[in-house]
From Swiss-Prot:
Gene3D superfamilies (UniProt xref): 3.40.50.880, P-loop containing nucleotide triphosphate hydrolases
Functional description taken from the UniProt entry: Catalyzes the ATP-dependent amidation of the two carboxylate groups at positions a and c of cobyrinate, using either L-glutamine or ammonia as the nitrogen source.
Cofactor (UniProt): Mg(2+)
Descriptive protein name: Cobyrinate a,c-diamide synthase
Pathway the protein contributes to: Cofactor biosynthesis; adenosylcobalamin biosynthesis; cob(II)yrinate a,c-diamide from sirohydrochlorin (anaerobic route): step 10/10
Its EC number(s): 6.3.5.11
SUPFAM superfamilies registered for this protein in UniProt: Class I glutamine amidotransferase-like (SSF52317), P-loop containing nucleoside triphosphate hydrolases (SSF52540)
Record's comment describing the protein's domains: Comprises of two domains. The C-terminal domain contains the binding site for glutamine and catalyzes the hydrolysis of this substrate to glutamate and ammonia. The N-terminal domain is anticipated to bind ATP and cobyrinate and catalyzes the ultimate synthesis of the diamide product. The ammonia produced via the glutaminase domain is probably translocated to the adjacent domain via a molecular tunnel, where it reacts with an activated intermediate.
GO BP annotation list: cobalamin biosynthetic process
Pfam family, one: CbiA
Keyword list, A-Z: ATP-binding, Cobalamin biosynthesis, Glutamine amidotransferase, Ligase, Magnesium, Nucleotide-binding
Organism listed in the record: Synechococcus sp. (strain ATCC 27144 / PCC 6301 / SAUG 1402/1)
Domain GATase cobBQ-type as annotated: residue spans: 247-439
Amino acid sequence: MALIIAGERSGVGKTTTTLTLLAALKARQASVQSFKVGPDYIDPMFHRFVTGRDCRNLDPILTDEDYVQHCFQQHSQTADYTLVEGVMGLFDGLTGKTDTASTAHIARILNLPILLVLNCSSTARSIAAIAYGYQNFDSRLKIAGLVLNRVGSDRHLELLKDALEPLEIPILGVLRRQDEIQIPDRHLGLIPTSELPHLQSVIDRLAVLGQQCFDWNRLEPLLSNSDLNSTAFKSTTPSISLKSSVPIAIARDRAFNFYYADNFDLLRAAGAELIEWSPLQDRQLPAGVQGLYLGGGFPEVFAAELSDNLLARQAVQTAITQGIPCYAECGGLMYLRQHIIDFEQTQYPMVGAIAATAQMGSRLTLGYREATAQQASPLLQKGQVVWGHEFHRSSLREPIAQPLFQLQNFDGSLHYGEGYSQPNLHASYLHLHFGGKPWLIQNFLQACQQATALSR
Protein backbone atom coordinates (compact mmCIF):
# COMPACT_ATOMS: atom_id res chain seq x y z
CA MET A 1 0.00 0.00 0.00
CA ALA A 2 1.03 3.62 -0.40
CA LEU A 3 -0.59 7.02 0.01
CA ILE A 4 -1.01 9.90 -2.38
CA ILE A 5 -1.02 13.36 -0.79
CA ALA A 6 -3.59 15.61 -2.45
CA GLY A 7 -4.74 19.14 -1.80
CA GLU A 8 -8.05 20.87 -2.23
CA ARG A 9 -6.10 23.39 -4.34
CA SER A 10 -2.57 24.69 -4.81
CA GLY A 11 -0.96 26.29 -1.78
CA VAL A 12 -2.82 24.37 0.93
CA GLY A 13 0.28 22.62 2.26
CA LYS A 14 0.80 19.46 0.19
CA THR A 15 4.57 19.88 0.10
CA THR A 16 4.77 20.76 3.80
CA THR A 17 2.66 17.71 4.67
CA THR A 18 4.71 15.47 2.39
CA LEU A 19 8.05 16.66 3.76
CA THR A 20 6.77 16.33 7.33
CA LEU A 21 5.76 12.71 6.74
CA LEU A 22 8.98 11.90 4.89
CA ALA A 23 11.09 13.46 7.64
CA ALA A 24 9.21 11.62 10.38
CA LEU A 25 9.59 8.28 8.60
CA LYS A 26 13.27 8.91 7.92
CA ALA A 27 13.79 9.73 11.60
CA ARG A 28 12.55 6.20 12.31
CA GLN A 29 15.44 4.87 10.21
CA ALA A 30 13.02 3.69 7.53
CA SER A 31 13.68 3.61 3.79
CA VAL A 32 11.14 5.78 2.01
CA GLN A 33 10.45 6.05 -1.71
CA SER A 34 8.76 9.24 -2.80
CA PHE A 35 7.11 10.24 -6.05
CA LYS A 36 5.83 13.50 -7.49
CA VAL A 37 2.84 13.80 -9.80
CA GLY A 38 3.57 15.86 -12.89
CA PRO A 39 6.67 17.42 -14.45
CA ASP A 40 7.97 19.44 -11.48
CA TYR A 41 11.70 19.40 -10.72
CA ILE A 42 11.98 21.36 -7.48
CA ASP A 43 9.70 19.43 -5.11
CA PRO A 44 11.60 16.19 -5.91
CA MET A 45 14.83 17.91 -4.82
CA PHE A 46 13.32 18.41 -1.36
CA HIS A 47 12.13 14.81 -1.26
CA ARG A 48 15.62 13.57 -2.06
CA PHE A 49 17.16 15.90 0.52
CA VAL A 50 15.00 14.24 3.19
CA THR A 51 15.00 10.59 2.10
CA GLY A 52 18.40 10.23 0.44
CA ARG A 53 16.66 8.50 -2.50
CA ASP A 54 15.81 9.95 -5.89
CA CYS A 55 12.21 11.06 -6.13
CA ARG A 56 10.52 9.82 -9.30
CA ASN A 57 8.07 11.81 -11.42
CA LEU A 58 4.76 10.19 -12.38
CA ASP A 59 3.56 11.95 -15.52
CA PRO A 60 1.15 10.21 -17.93
CA ILE A 61 1.58 12.95 -20.55
CA LEU A 62 5.38 13.07 -20.75
CA THR A 63 5.37 9.26 -20.52
CA ASP A 64 2.20 7.10 -20.50
CA GLU A 65 0.06 5.14 -18.03
CA ASP A 66 2.07 1.94 -18.47
CA TYR A 67 5.30 3.75 -17.68
CA VAL A 68 3.72 5.36 -14.60
CA GLN A 69 2.77 1.91 -13.28
CA HIS A 70 6.18 0.48 -14.14
CA CYS A 71 8.06 3.33 -12.46
CA PHE A 72 5.93 3.18 -9.33
CA GLN A 73 6.23 -0.58 -8.85
CA GLN A 74 9.92 -0.75 -9.70
CA HIS A 75 11.04 1.82 -7.17
CA SER A 76 8.51 1.12 -4.41
CA GLN A 77 9.65 -2.50 -4.16
CA THR A 78 12.98 -1.53 -2.60
CA ALA A 79 11.59 0.71 0.16
CA ASP A 80 9.75 0.21 3.44
CA TYR A 81 7.27 3.02 2.76
CA THR A 82 5.96 4.86 -0.29
CA LEU A 83 4.51 8.35 -0.51
CA VAL A 84 3.28 10.24 -3.58
CA GLU A 85 2.95 14.03 -3.59
CA GLY A 86 0.17 15.29 -5.83
CA VAL A 87 -0.04 18.40 -7.98
CA MET A 88 -2.36 21.42 -7.63
CA GLY A 89 -5.87 20.48 -6.46
CA LEU A 90 -6.94 16.84 -6.46
CA PHE A 91 -8.94 17.05 -9.69
CA ASP A 92 -6.95 19.77 -11.50
CA GLY A 93 -5.67 18.39 -14.79
CA LEU A 94 -5.13 19.55 -18.33
CA THR A 95 -8.63 20.87 -18.93
CA GLY A 96 -11.72 21.82 -17.00
CA LYS A 97 -13.67 18.96 -18.57
CA THR A 98 -11.40 16.08 -17.52
CA ASP A 99 -8.89 15.30 -14.79
CA THR A 100 -6.25 13.93 -17.16
CA ALA A 101 -2.75 14.24 -15.63
CA SER A 102 -4.23 15.25 -12.26
CA THR A 103 -3.55 13.74 -8.86
CA ALA A 104 -6.90 11.93 -9.15
CA HIS A 105 -5.81 10.44 -12.48
CA ILE A 106 -2.62 9.03 -10.92
CA ALA A 107 -4.56 7.74 -7.90
CA ARG A 108 -6.81 5.76 -10.25
CA ILE A 109 -3.93 4.44 -12.37
CA LEU A 110 -2.14 3.14 -9.26
CA ASN A 111 -5.25 2.38 -7.18
CA LEU A 112 -3.95 4.47 -4.28
CA PRO A 113 -5.89 5.85 -1.31
CA ILE A 114 -5.77 9.62 -0.87
CA LEU A 115 -4.72 11.74 2.10
CA LEU A 116 -6.46 15.07 1.50
CA VAL A 117 -4.86 18.25 2.86
CA LEU A 118 -7.32 21.01 3.79
CA ASN A 119 -6.42 24.63 4.46
CA CYS A 120 -8.40 25.37 7.62
CA SER A 121 -7.34 28.98 7.97
CA SER A 122 -10.31 31.35 8.43
CA THR A 123 -12.95 28.62 8.26
CA ALA A 124 -14.84 26.30 10.61
CA ARG A 125 -18.07 24.46 9.67
CA SER A 126 -17.57 25.30 5.99
CA ILE A 127 -14.64 22.88 5.93
CA ALA A 128 -17.17 20.03 6.02
CA ALA A 129 -18.77 21.21 2.77
CA ILE A 130 -15.37 21.22 1.09
CA ALA A 131 -14.48 17.76 2.38
CA TYR A 132 -17.92 16.42 1.42
CA GLY A 133 -17.47 17.65 -2.13
CA TYR A 134 -14.12 15.97 -2.52
CA GLN A 135 -15.41 12.78 -0.90
CA ASN A 136 -18.31 12.46 -3.35
CA PHE A 137 -17.09 14.07 -6.58
CA ASP A 138 -15.60 10.84 -7.97
CA SER A 139 -16.82 7.55 -6.48
CA ARG A 140 -13.83 5.69 -7.96
CA LEU A 141 -11.50 7.38 -5.48
CA LYS A 142 -10.99 6.59 -1.81
CA ILE A 143 -10.31 9.47 0.58
CA ALA A 144 -8.50 7.54 3.32
CA GLY A 145 -8.03 10.49 5.63
CA LEU A 146 -7.66 14.22 6.12
CA VAL A 147 -4.85 16.50 7.19
CA LEU A 148 -6.08 19.72 8.76
CA ASN A 149 -3.48 22.37 8.00
CA ARG A 150 -3.05 25.89 9.41
CA VAL A 151 -5.21 25.19 12.43
CA GLY A 152 -5.29 28.01 14.98
CA SER A 153 -6.43 27.50 18.57
CA ASP A 154 -7.70 24.39 20.33
CA ARG A 155 -11.20 25.86 20.02
CA HIS A 156 -10.69 26.16 16.27
CA LEU A 157 -9.70 22.49 16.09
CA GLU A 158 -12.76 21.47 18.11
CA LEU A 159 -15.05 23.32 15.68
CA LEU A 160 -13.40 21.63 12.71
CA LYS A 161 -13.71 18.16 14.22
CA ASP A 162 -17.37 18.70 15.10
CA ALA A 163 -18.12 19.83 11.55
CA LEU A 164 -16.31 16.89 9.94
CA GLU A 165 -17.58 14.14 12.25
CA PRO A 166 -20.71 13.24 10.20
CA LEU A 167 -18.56 12.54 7.12
CA GLU A 168 -16.72 9.72 8.92
CA ILE A 169 -13.42 10.53 7.23
CA PRO A 170 -10.52 9.89 9.62
CA ILE A 171 -8.50 12.94 10.62
CA LEU A 172 -4.96 11.56 10.35
CA GLY A 173 -3.02 14.75 10.93
CA VAL A 174 -3.31 18.25 12.36
CA LEU A 175 -0.73 20.91 11.55
CA ARG A 176 -0.82 24.20 13.40
CA ARG A 177 0.29 27.51 11.95
CA GLN A 178 4.08 27.41 11.93
CA ASP A 179 6.13 30.37 10.70
CA GLU A 180 9.46 28.62 11.33
CA ILE A 181 8.83 25.88 8.76
CA GLN A 182 8.28 28.16 5.79
CA ILE A 183 10.45 27.45 2.73
CA PRO A 184 11.24 30.53 0.59
CA ASP A 185 10.26 30.75 -3.06
CA ARG A 186 10.86 32.94 -6.11
CA HIS A 187 9.73 33.30 -9.73
CA LEU A 188 9.53 29.57 -10.61
CA GLY A 189 8.44 28.19 -7.23
CA LEU A 190 10.44 27.02 -4.23
CA ILE A 191 14.13 27.89 -4.08
CA PRO A 192 16.16 24.71 -4.78
CA THR A 193 17.75 22.85 -1.89
CA SER A 194 21.30 23.69 -2.98
CA GLU A 195 20.63 27.37 -2.23
CA LEU A 196 19.20 26.84 1.27
CA PRO A 197 22.06 26.42 3.78
CA HIS A 198 19.68 26.19 6.76
CA LEU A 199 17.27 23.69 5.22
CA GLN A 200 18.37 20.81 7.46
CA SER A 201 17.19 22.66 10.56
CA VAL A 202 13.77 23.10 8.95
CA ILE A 203 13.61 19.39 8.10
CA ASP A 204 14.64 18.49 11.65
CA ARG A 205 11.76 20.60 12.93
CA LEU A 206 9.37 18.91 10.50
CA ALA A 207 10.51 15.48 11.71
CA VAL A 208 9.56 16.41 15.27
CA LEU A 209 6.22 17.83 14.15
CA GLY A 210 5.58 14.70 12.15
CA GLN A 211 5.93 12.46 15.18
CA GLN A 212 3.60 14.68 17.20
CA CYS A 213 0.94 15.72 14.70
CA PHE A 214 -0.11 12.52 12.90
CA ASP A 215 -2.10 9.46 13.92
CA TRP A 216 0.61 6.90 13.16
CA ASN A 217 -1.41 3.91 14.32
CA ARG A 218 -3.79 4.46 11.41
CA LEU A 219 -1.36 6.15 9.03
CA GLU A 220 1.55 3.72 9.04
CA PRO A 221 -0.35 0.74 7.55
CA LEU A 222 -1.42 2.96 4.65
CA LEU A 223 2.20 3.89 3.90
CA SER A 224 3.79 0.47 4.34
CA ASN A 225 4.94 -1.56 1.34
CA SER A 226 4.54 -4.88 3.17
CA ASP A 227 1.69 -5.97 0.88
CA LEU A 228 3.18 -4.66 -2.37
CA ASN A 229 3.32 -7.42 -4.96
CA SER A 230 6.64 -8.07 -6.65
CA THR A 231 6.05 -7.68 -10.35
CA ALA A 232 8.27 -8.28 -13.36
CA PHE A 233 8.22 -5.52 -15.96
CA LYS A 234 9.25 -5.24 -19.54
CA SER A 235 12.34 -3.08 -19.86
CA THR A 236 11.83 0.46 -21.19
CA THR A 237 15.49 0.74 -22.17
CA PRO A 238 15.94 0.85 -25.94
CA SER A 239 18.06 -1.82 -27.58
CA ILE A 240 21.19 -0.04 -28.77
CA SER A 241 24.28 -1.58 -30.27
CA LEU A 242 27.16 0.48 -28.87
CA LYS A 243 30.80 -0.37 -29.41
CA SER A 244 31.62 0.93 -25.93
CA SER A 245 30.20 3.21 -23.25
CA VAL A 246 29.61 6.79 -24.38
CA PRO A 247 30.89 9.53 -22.02
CA ILE A 248 28.40 12.39 -21.67
CA ALA A 249 29.15 15.62 -19.78
CA ILE A 250 26.20 16.62 -17.55
CA ALA A 251 26.04 20.27 -16.45
CA ARG A 252 25.09 19.99 -12.79
CA ASP A 253 25.50 22.67 -10.14
CA ARG A 254 23.43 25.44 -8.53
CA ALA A 255 22.65 26.97 -11.94
CA PHE A 256 21.71 23.72 -13.69
CA ASN A 257 19.85 21.11 -11.66
CA PHE A 258 16.54 20.38 -13.38
CA TYR A 259 16.88 16.71 -14.33
CA TYR A 260 14.60 13.69 -14.09
CA ALA A 261 16.30 10.84 -12.24
CA ASP A 262 14.74 8.44 -14.73
CA ASN A 263 16.51 10.18 -17.61
CA PHE A 264 19.87 9.50 -15.99
CA ASP A 265 18.94 5.88 -15.27
CA LEU A 266 17.75 5.30 -18.82
CA LEU A 267 20.88 6.86 -20.31
CA ARG A 268 23.15 4.72 -18.13
CA ALA A 269 21.18 1.57 -18.92
CA ALA A 270 21.57 2.30 -22.62
CA GLY A 271 25.35 2.64 -22.36
CA ALA A 272 26.08 6.24 -21.38
CA GLU A 273 28.76 7.18 -18.86
CA LEU A 274 27.50 10.34 -17.17
CA ILE A 275 30.22 12.75 -16.02
CA GLU A 276 29.09 15.75 -14.01
CA TRP A 277 30.76 19.12 -14.45
CA SER A 278 29.97 22.66 -13.32
CA PRO A 279 29.60 25.61 -15.72
CA LEU A 280 29.93 27.78 -12.61
CA GLN A 281 33.21 26.39 -11.28
CA ASP A 282 34.96 24.16 -13.84
CA ARG A 283 37.17 25.76 -16.47
CA GLN A 284 37.09 22.92 -18.97
CA LEU A 285 34.79 20.13 -20.05
CA PRO A 286 35.79 16.62 -18.97
CA ALA A 287 38.34 15.18 -21.39
CA GLY A 288 37.14 12.54 -23.80
CA VAL A 289 33.41 13.29 -23.68
CA GLN A 290 31.37 12.62 -26.79
CA GLY A 291 28.21 14.46 -25.80
CA LEU A 292 26.84 17.35 -23.72
CA TYR A 293 23.62 17.45 -21.69
CA LEU A 294 22.70 20.93 -20.45
CA GLY A 295 19.59 20.69 -18.28
CA GLY A 296 17.31 23.36 -16.93
CA GLY A 297 17.71 25.45 -13.82
CA PHE A 298 18.29 29.08 -12.94
CA PRO A 299 21.05 30.50 -15.18
CA GLU A 300 19.40 33.91 -14.82
CA VAL A 301 20.06 33.85 -11.05
CA PHE A 302 23.72 32.95 -11.58
CA ALA A 303 24.23 34.87 -14.82
CA ALA A 304 27.10 36.96 -13.47
CA GLU A 305 29.04 33.89 -12.30
CA LEU A 306 28.35 32.00 -15.51
CA SER A 307 29.48 34.99 -17.54
CA ASP A 308 32.65 35.41 -15.47
CA ASN A 309 33.67 31.81 -16.22
CA LEU A 310 34.91 32.65 -19.71
CA LEU A 311 36.94 29.45 -20.11
CA ALA A 312 33.88 27.26 -19.49
CA ARG A 313 31.85 29.24 -22.01
CA GLN A 314 34.60 28.93 -24.58
CA ALA A 315 34.94 25.20 -23.89
CA VAL A 316 31.25 24.61 -24.61
CA GLN A 317 31.38 26.72 -27.76
CA THR A 318 34.47 24.84 -28.96
CA ALA A 319 32.87 21.45 -28.28
CA ILE A 320 29.77 22.33 -30.30
CA THR A 321 31.88 23.80 -33.10
CA GLN A 322 33.92 20.58 -33.21
CA GLY A 323 30.74 18.55 -33.69
CA ILE A 324 30.11 17.18 -30.18
CA PRO A 325 26.33 16.47 -29.93
CA CYS A 326 24.62 18.74 -27.41
CA TYR A 327 21.18 18.40 -25.85
CA ALA A 328 20.10 21.60 -24.08
CA GLU A 329 16.71 22.28 -22.52
CA CYS A 330 15.34 25.52 -21.06
CA GLY A 331 18.14 26.83 -18.80
CA GLY A 332 20.65 25.02 -20.98
CA LEU A 333 19.17 26.75 -24.03
CA MET A 334 19.53 30.12 -22.30
CA TYR A 335 23.18 29.38 -21.50
CA LEU A 336 23.93 28.65 -25.17
CA ARG A 337 22.59 32.02 -26.30
CA GLN A 338 24.75 35.09 -26.80
CA HIS A 339 23.39 36.93 -23.75
CA ILE A 340 21.03 36.68 -20.79
CA ILE A 341 19.26 39.87 -19.69
CA ASP A 342 18.10 39.40 -16.10
CA PHE A 343 15.13 40.89 -14.24
CA GLU A 344 17.16 44.03 -13.47
CA GLN A 345 17.87 44.48 -17.21
CA THR A 346 21.57 43.70 -16.79
CA GLN A 347 23.05 41.93 -19.82
CA TYR A 348 25.54 39.09 -19.39
CA PRO A 349 27.53 37.34 -22.16
CA MET A 350 26.92 33.60 -22.44
CA VAL A 351 28.27 30.83 -24.73
CA GLY A 352 27.14 32.34 -28.02
CA ALA A 353 26.44 29.08 -29.84
CA ILE A 354 22.97 30.45 -30.67
CA ALA A 355 22.69 33.96 -32.12
CA ALA A 356 19.95 35.18 -29.80
CA THR A 357 19.39 36.82 -26.41
CA ALA A 358 17.36 35.46 -23.49
CA GLN A 359 15.28 38.22 -21.88
CA MET A 360 13.75 37.65 -18.45
CA GLY A 361 10.23 38.98 -17.90
CA SER A 362 7.13 38.68 -15.75
CA ARG A 363 5.12 36.50 -18.15
CA LEU A 364 5.09 32.81 -17.25
CA THR A 365 5.05 30.34 -20.13
CA LEU A 366 3.65 27.11 -18.74
CA GLY A 367 2.11 23.91 -20.02
CA TYR A 368 2.34 20.66 -21.92
CA ARG A 369 3.11 20.84 -25.62
CA GLU A 370 2.86 18.35 -28.45
CA ALA A 371 6.01 19.04 -30.46
CA THR A 372 6.53 18.04 -34.08
CA ALA A 373 10.12 18.24 -35.29
CA GLN A 374 10.47 20.60 -38.26
CA GLN A 375 14.21 19.97 -38.46
CA ALA A 376 16.43 17.03 -37.57
CA SER A 377 18.50 17.13 -34.38
CA PRO A 378 20.68 14.66 -32.46
CA LEU A 379 17.49 13.45 -30.70
CA LEU A 380 14.86 13.51 -33.44
CA GLN A 381 14.32 13.05 -37.12
CA LYS A 382 12.19 15.54 -39.02
CA GLY A 383 8.51 14.73 -38.52
CA GLN A 384 8.89 12.84 -35.24
CA VAL A 385 6.54 13.86 -32.43
CA VAL A 386 7.16 14.15 -28.68
CA TRP A 387 5.34 15.56 -25.68
CA GLY A 388 7.22 18.07 -23.56
CA HIS A 389 6.62 20.67 -20.87
CA GLU A 390 7.42 24.38 -20.82
CA PHE A 391 8.00 26.35 -17.62
CA HIS A 392 9.95 29.61 -17.95
CA ARG A 393 9.84 33.38 -17.63
CA SER A 394 12.43 34.15 -20.29
CA SER A 395 11.70 34.87 -23.92
CA LEU A 396 13.53 35.24 -27.17
CA ARG A 397 14.35 38.72 -28.44
CA GLU A 398 15.03 37.55 -31.99
CA PRO A 399 12.72 35.49 -34.25
CA ILE A 400 13.69 31.91 -35.14
CA ALA A 401 14.13 31.48 -38.88
CA GLN A 402 13.84 27.69 -38.90
CA PRO A 403 12.49 26.45 -35.55
CA LEU A 404 13.20 22.95 -34.34
CA PHE A 405 9.60 22.35 -33.26
CA GLN A 406 6.08 23.32 -34.17
CA LEU A 407 4.20 23.26 -30.88
CA GLN A 408 0.55 22.58 -30.17
CA ASN A 409 -1.34 22.91 -26.92
CA PHE A 410 -3.08 19.90 -25.42
CA ASP A 411 -6.39 20.90 -27.02
CA GLY A 412 -4.76 20.88 -30.45
CA SER A 413 -4.66 24.65 -30.91
CA LEU A 414 -1.58 25.92 -32.71
CA HIS A 415 1.00 27.43 -30.42
CA TYR A 416 4.23 28.53 -32.14
CA GLY A 417 7.58 27.52 -33.59
CA GLU A 418 10.29 26.95 -30.99
CA GLY A 419 13.81 25.62 -30.52
CA TYR A 420 17.08 25.44 -32.42
CA SER A 421 18.75 22.59 -34.22
CA GLN A 422 21.94 21.78 -36.03
CA PRO A 423 23.22 18.34 -37.01
CA ASN A 424 24.82 18.16 -33.55
CA LEU A 425 22.60 20.55 -31.55
CA HIS A 426 19.16 20.17 -29.97
CA ALA A 427 18.25 23.27 -27.92
CA SER A 428 14.69 23.92 -26.77
CA TYR A 429 12.58 25.25 -23.93
CA LEU A 430 10.81 21.88 -23.84
CA HIS A 431 11.63 19.55 -20.97
CA LEU A 432 11.50 15.92 -22.14
CA HIS A 433 11.15 12.68 -20.19
CA PHE A 434 12.99 9.88 -21.98
CA GLY A 435 10.61 7.30 -20.53
CA GLY A 436 7.97 8.59 -22.92
CA LYS A 437 10.03 8.03 -26.06
CA PRO A 438 13.02 5.74 -25.39
CA TRP A 439 14.17 6.20 -28.98
CA LEU A 440 15.27 9.72 -28.00
CA ILE A 441 18.10 8.05 -26.08
CA GLN A 442 18.92 5.78 -28.97
CA ASN A 443 19.18 8.70 -31.39
CA PHE A 444 21.27 10.80 -29.00
CA LEU A 445 23.74 8.09 -28.01
CA GLN A 446 24.23 6.93 -31.56
CA ALA A 447 24.99 10.53 -32.58
CA CYS A 448 27.42 10.84 -29.65
CA GLN A 449 29.17 7.58 -30.48
CA GLN A 450 29.84 8.80 -34.00
CA ALA A 451 31.43 12.01 -32.71
CA THR A 452 35.16 12.34 -32.20
CA ALA A 453 35.91 12.45 -28.47
CA LEU A 454 36.68 15.93 -27.15
CA SER A 455 40.37 16.59 -26.54
CA ARG A 456 41.92 19.49 -24.71
